[in-house]
Amino acid sequence: MEERMTEMTRPGPVPDEQSKAYWDSVAAHAMELQRCTRCETFRFYPTAVCPQCFSTGFDWRPVSGRARLYSYSIVHKPVTEAFAEESPYVVALITLAEGPTMMTNLVEVPHEEIAIGMELKVSYRDFDGFTLPVAIRP
């Protein structure tokens, strides 16, 4: 049986009505998150209703980009060929200074230097047709 490898492209975001402003801010390298206009809680991922007070009012606010590493996993075997060149890579949960936790990739940090609680900052990686946030050292 002949095994064929096909070139895969990196999956990108599919913005919807709730997330379009977020993805636009990421593309501009200036991340903004929703903030509830009633309780002033920042939230991620964008939603129509605040998970804290159930208000439907929100605005978009720039975030500092400061974060700390909450958890991580080093992926040695990518699930698709699109990530093969980057393997092993780090999938991280980071807690932003404004409160929300988000999943991203931790880049430019040697694996042996990764530590829970380490200070990070949000940066951006541009791909063909889209931009993703990543975490790096400050």
Task: Go through the PLM ranges and name each one.
Residues 1-31, 137-138:
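A broadly conserved sequence feature marking short terminus-proximal activation segments
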Residues 86-102:
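Short, basic/aromatic beta-hairpin or loop at an interaction surface
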Residues 4, 99, 103-138:
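Well-ordered alpha/beta subsegment
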Residues 35-38, 49-55:
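Short, cysteine/histidine-rich loop/knuckle motifs that typically chelate Zn2+
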Residues 72-77, 126-128:
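Short, conserved beta-turn/loop elements at beta-strand boundaries and strand-helix junctions
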Residues 66-68, 72, 109:
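Residue-level recognition of beta-strand microenvironments
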Residues 30-33, 47:
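Residues immediately within or flanking Cys/His clusters that coordinate Zn2+
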Residues 43, 56-57:
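Cys/His-rich microdomains that often coordinate metals
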